């Protein structure tokens, strides 16, 4: 198995600028900067020559994939299950109290409490149960067939959770190292159905369980 799974966060959205907890489908659109970020992502991915680009059904992820696909010459496809962590009653909230409540629950997931949730929102188990099977299917259909790298355009909180769990990335590192818009995380399939996380944005493995200064973007 030689191909890598490249998990890419979408470009900047109007909700990101407004610091709104925007998780429900279809969600906010990309800003002009977000479009530019998506195009730059595509240019950077050209040298990787991915065989497939897929995204969540959120507008921001689909737009990012569509702008990124042009330099590569692929047609992006949307898949169920790849959307952002759902925040229930906190949807569209931008107040500090809501951000802190979500982050408290999110940090508890990385500490091992996978069943906690904000009111009306998803637990980590809910997210993993819908997200991981999509990645497993892509692995079997593409990566294990020698098709090269594949790109999944998704969302910051979901990517960090899934990549940390699958790639055994320390929780402190995952919490402390948010993903900026169009940052990527790379997973490599290993024997026995597992995954190894080899890159997290600008960092390469090994990853250390130390918290860094966090981001003010709650979904990054």
Where are each of the predicted segments found?
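Acidic, low-complexity terminal tails and accessory targeting/binding regions
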Residues: 1-3, 85-97, 140, 144-148, ...
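Active-site-proximal alpha-helix that buttresses catalytic centers in soluble enzyme cores
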Residues: 3, 8-72, 122
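Beta-strand elements within well-structured catalytic alpha/beta cores of enzymes
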Residues: 4-8, 146-154, 158
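Short active-site segment of divalent metal-dependent hydrolases/proteases
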Residues: 13, 158-159
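Phosphate-handling substructures
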Residues: 15, 29, 71-132, 198-201, ...
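Generic structural signal for well-ordered alpha-helical scaffold segments
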Residues: 39-46, 128, 132-143
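Short beta-strand scaffold positions
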Residues: 55-56, 129, 153-154
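Active-site signature of alpha/beta-hydrolase-fold catalytic machinery across serine-
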Residues: 67, 161-165
